[in-house]
Amino acid sequence: MKPRFESSLANRAAQVVITLAGLALFLAIRPDIYASVSNRLMSDYQRKVVTPKLISDYMQRSREPKLQVGAGLNNADGWLNSDIEPSATQAYIDITERLPFHDMTLHAILGEQVIEHVTYEEGFRFFREAWRVLAPGGKLRVITPNLLSFVALFSDQKPPAYMARKLDFHYWPADTPDPACFIINGEMRSWGHQFVYTPKMLRASLEKAGFADVRQYAPGVTDDPDFKAVEVRAKTEWKDLNDFDSMAFEATR
């Protein structure tokens, strides 16, 4: 006769095996739930394990730490690249949350085609956070759609080449009687856009966040070599679209 504790241990082991087998069968029947659970576990691991290590390692080895938010596929050398859907080499950073850095520790922050994906209030909080974590003299560069460019599509000065290229690029109906209507609706509603700025509104938000020196540039144009090296859309097939419909602002702490 087996001792009671051995029998109890065997029973628990059997229960665990049965439970795991049942879970495996359920997940096999419902792959959608399996995918959801798997993605959640990977996301938690990325946020709680991978990201803190990436940030710690980068901050230790970098003399002038630079952060890129919403990096996507643009893994820039010498920068801490981050995204809300990061890869193994990117940190998980959500710009609507508190930035995971001490006060006055970063040299530069870049957000290319990012700020329009959050609300105005969330964008302002990000600007405040950027001001907090930038060292004195540190810069934030923001590239984002310019609402005035889309308003201009309804004027007599609208550029036909841009409109044709935009409609073709985004597969909107080229035979529409009012292409500008499709374009401006796309900019305001598609790709997760939440708030599209005018130059006046973006400048005011940056200054309200605490930045004293705020300057506007054309996309791809900057006096800072760090930003010049990493900004990507001004060097791609989207350059002609980017040049017309986007604006860049640099704000110094």
Question: What is each of the regions a protein language model found here?
Answer:
Residues 122-131, 135, 139-252:
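S-adenosyl-L-methionine-dependent methyltransferase catalytic module, highlighting the catalytic core
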